[in-house]
């Protein structure tokens, strides 16, 4: 696409200019692959990574898009349509993911209901008949609103030719007053997601956006709770479409103190409170990520006969300096650089000539230290998997060390609010693996498999059941409070939703954030809806032999998001085809 090509060219220019600004020693560590400076293709622009969009402010108080005033909507259909327009504008103004909340849309369900009630108030009829008509009319409007929302999110394009990387928070108790309205919206979203969205072959396939974040709480997790029916529908949806994903209110409150959504696929904000002591989540964001290649560190320490943590400190300091560079380059930037964010409510309501750094400071934007390959680093250092007792002890020591470094940096420089982040590694898994191979040659259980394991995750080849995997990874996720997510791999579970429900309830009790992965593919030649096989370097339909990637949809969890194009880098593809089933 022309827009994508233009963005790629601009990205190469940005990378070249970034090399003239970033200190030589930091750039050299990136080039060697000891660290990864993410999103250098956007570095020269005064923009940031990801955010929680303050949709409530924008819908209730109005916003401006393309110099046109958008006033408070008067129906759920209009509100959801405006939400997609906001999302596209926000996505074109940053380079990471974004999250909106159904709680901010729920009041407009009530407005629509009141309009329907007024419409039928003048007609004489039995109260129970009127109530049924009102309910039916409201559900029709919600259905139309959700359908428009889905089509908009999946057909709108940002300035780089992509759909907005949007997540939707579905948290019934985020504002208990609107729990019922949130449930009505979620019900319709799940129903339409189950049905699927027709792809270019006319097959109802799994839609990739928006990502759905469903919060498990006391009122929806177990049989007998008020909204258990909605969780049953959510599980059915997951069993077919790999969405929603699940966040545990119980565990988040135990570990963090509050429950709130991720920014996009996994980034989590640090706590920040306003002058009245109220926690603030929406209208905040993250300034960027730099990731340390832990198996690279382990191999360098082993080669040079040095202490692992001594070598680690060297590369961590480079990451710290890079994070401060990201913060400092936003100093002096005026709000007019991106009105939708800084002037019209997504983040703040500044005047055009106000400095954005004041909001970044006052609202506690985070900077993140990413990490990759705890499994491989443990294998190099201790000779065992981190699922063993000895390996787990080292892994806990390592992730706690990284967590403490973030606390130390934040204390020394309160402007950079550091948080520890389990890097998604969509491309980094390949980048790091090849970097290690260049520096150290082929290394068993590190480079020979062709990829580096995501963050603290269990090696994708290791046999372990879903319940044990989530329980084990929870001990490490609890320290990765700048963002992390755990997965389990299953077969498609349409015929066994009861088993999947047990996994979901296990997530509620044991881990803050979990997802379920399986294959959801379609063949555009024969119409097969099943699993494409990877044969001789090509995805191939087992029914008709079609191996033209343009004539099929291969849908997998690539990082936190789903992807259905099947054209992933070598490392990510090897990760995907090596995944064992946990259920």
For each predicted feature, which ranges?
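Conserved catalytic cores of very large enzyme subunits
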Residues: 1-363, 384, 388-554
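Long insertion/accessory domains within large nucleic-acid-processing enzymes
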Residues: 543-583
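Metallocofactor- and cofactor-centric catalytic cores in central/energy metabolism, strongly enriched
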Residues: 140-150, 379-380, 563, 572, ...
């Amino acid at each position: 696409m022309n827009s994508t090509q233009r963005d790629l060219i601009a990205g190469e220019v940005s990378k070249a200019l970034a090399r003239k600004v970033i200190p030589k020693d930091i750039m050299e560590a990136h080039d060697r692959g000891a660290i990864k400076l993410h999103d250098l293709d956007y570095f020269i622009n005064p923009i940031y990574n990801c955010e929680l969009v303050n949709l409530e402010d924008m819908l209730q108080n109005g916003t401006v898009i393309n110099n046109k005033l958008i006033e408070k909507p008067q129906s759920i259909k209009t509100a959801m349509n405006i939400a997609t327009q906001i999302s596209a504008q926000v996505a074109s103004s940053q380079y990471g993911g974004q999250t909106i909340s159904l709680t901010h849309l729920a009041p407009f369900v009530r407005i629509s209901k009141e309009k329907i009630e007024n419409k039928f108030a003048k007609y004489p009829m039995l109260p129970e008949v009127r109530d049924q008509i009102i309910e039916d009319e409201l559900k029709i409007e919600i259905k139309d609103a959700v359908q428009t929302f889905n089509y908009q999110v999946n057909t709108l394009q940002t300035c780089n030719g992509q759909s907005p990387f949007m997540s939707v928070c579905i948290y019934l108790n985020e504002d208990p007053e609107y729990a019922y309205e949130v449930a009505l919206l979620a019900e319709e979203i799940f129903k339409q997601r189950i049905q699927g969205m027709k792809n270019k072959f006319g097959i109802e396939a799994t839609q990739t956006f928006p990502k759905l974040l469903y919060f498990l709480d006391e009122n929806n997790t177990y049989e007998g709770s008020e909204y258990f029916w909605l969780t049953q529908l959510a599980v059915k949806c997951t069993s077919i479409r790999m969405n929603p994903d699940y966040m545990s209110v119980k565990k988040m409150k135990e570990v963090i103190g509050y429950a709130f959504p991720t920014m996009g696929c996994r980034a989590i904000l640090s706590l920040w409170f306003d002058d009245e002591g109220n926690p603030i989540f929406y209208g905040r964001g993250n300034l960027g990520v730099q990731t340390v290649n832990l198996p690279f560190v382990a191999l360098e320490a082993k080669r040079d006969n040095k202490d692992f943590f001594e070598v680690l400190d060297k590369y961590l300091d480079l990451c710290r300096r890079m994070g401060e560079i990201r913060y400092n380059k936003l100093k002096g930037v005026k709000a007019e650089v991106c009105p939708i964010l800084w002037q019209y409510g997504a983040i703040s309501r500044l005047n055009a000539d106000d400095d954005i750094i004041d909001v970044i400071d006052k609202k506690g934007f985070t900077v993140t230290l990413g990490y990759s390959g705890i499994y491989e680093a443990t294998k190099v250092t201790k000779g065992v998997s981190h699922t063993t007792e000895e390996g787990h002890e080292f892994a806990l020591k390592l992730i706690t060390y990284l967590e403490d470094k973030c606390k130390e940096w934040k204390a020394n420089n309160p402007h950079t609010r550091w948080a520890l982040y389990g890097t998604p590694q969509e491309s980094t898994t390949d980048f790091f693996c090849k970097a290690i191979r260049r520096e150290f040659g082929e290394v068993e259980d590190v480079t020979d498999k062709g990829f580096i394991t995501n963050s603290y995750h269990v090696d994708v080849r290791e046999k372990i059941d879903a319940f044990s995997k989530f329980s084990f990874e929870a001990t490490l996720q609890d320290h990765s409070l700048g963002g992390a997510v755990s997965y389990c791999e299953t077969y498609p579970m349409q015929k066994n939703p009861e088993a999947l429900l047990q996994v979901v309830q296990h997530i509620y009790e044991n881990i803050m954030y979990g997802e379920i992965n399986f294959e959801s593919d379609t063949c555009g030649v024969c119409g097969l809806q099943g699993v494409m096989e990877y044969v001789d370097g090509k995805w191939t339909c087992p029914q008709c032999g079609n191996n033209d990637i343009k004539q099929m949809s291969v849908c997998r969890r690539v990082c936190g998001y789903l992807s259905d194009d099947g054209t992933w880098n070598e490392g990510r593809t090897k990760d995907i085809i090596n995944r064992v089933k946990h259920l």
